[in-house]
Amino acid sequence: MAISRQQLAKELEPGLNALFGLEYKNYENQHAEIFDTENSDRAFEEEVMLSGFDKAGVKSEGAAVAYDNAQETFTARYQHETIALAFSLTEEAIEDNLYDKISTRYTKALARSMAQTKQTKAANVLNNAFKASGYNGGDGESLIGNAHPTIAGNLSNRPATLADLSETSLEQAMIDIASFKDERGLKIAAKAMKLIIPSANQFVAERLMKSANRVGTADNDINALRSMGMVPQGYVVNNFLTDDDAFFLKTDAVSYTHLTLPTSQYV
């Protein structure tokens, strides 16, 4: 349905001091702190998880060498989505408006809507990361869980007990990340690179990441997280995260990828 003079009645009358409600600042490109962007020219993209080899065993003199098998374990498919929204104006609404050019005004509003949709959908990958169904990865498990199946057994990428952001929980996360293993149970030299938090956690994160001494204690201990450079890229706030208690650590082991298609020539 087109926007008509009925929806813009006040703008047909002289004497308005201002029109407001559309000129707000935006949170720009916060998805880039979570995802690395790659281009795509296909309807979907697939990524295959590979398994290498187990640790080698001792071979007795003259005995045959033991052989091991490498294999594919699972495939993740990423299906592109088309995000669309439009508006239309009646000729009379355009001609009889006494103020700014309304087509330009609402084109800017539409761009803001599209941009915020992009940020919301990107953050929803983390917002839904703990859900047991409907948002599973290629291994059939939620993005963050304690039962990711591998050839060597189940692996976890979450705390044994979920906890709010604190010195204790952040240090335990560093310990857990250092113990990550691959499909065959070989240790991965993974390191936390960036802390991703909702805005409600920014003050806690600032104290934890930048205080020279430990936070909330009278002990004259150094802040080990800071002095050891455990999170070299610091913390970033994502204003589209919906759980005020959640925090996420991006490691250097595997990156999240945001796949983009060329903009349609018809848009």
Question: What feature does the model see in each segment?
Answer:
Residues 74-134, 195:
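Long, contiguous amphipathic alpha-helices that act as assembly "spine/axial" helices in icosahedral shell
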Residues 266:
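Cationic, low-complexity basic patches in intrinsically disordered or flexible, solvent-exposed regions
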Residues 1-25:
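N-terminal alpha-helical "arm" segments
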Residues 22-83:
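Assembly/oligomerization interface modules of large self-assembling protein complexes
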Residues 216-221:
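Gly/Ser/Thr-rich active-site loops/lids in small-molecule metabolic enzymes
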Residues 131-215, 228-246, 250-256:
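Extended, solvent-exposed, turn-rich assembly/linker loops in the middle of proteins
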Residues 257-263:
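Conserved small/polar residues in nucleotide/adenosyl-binding loops
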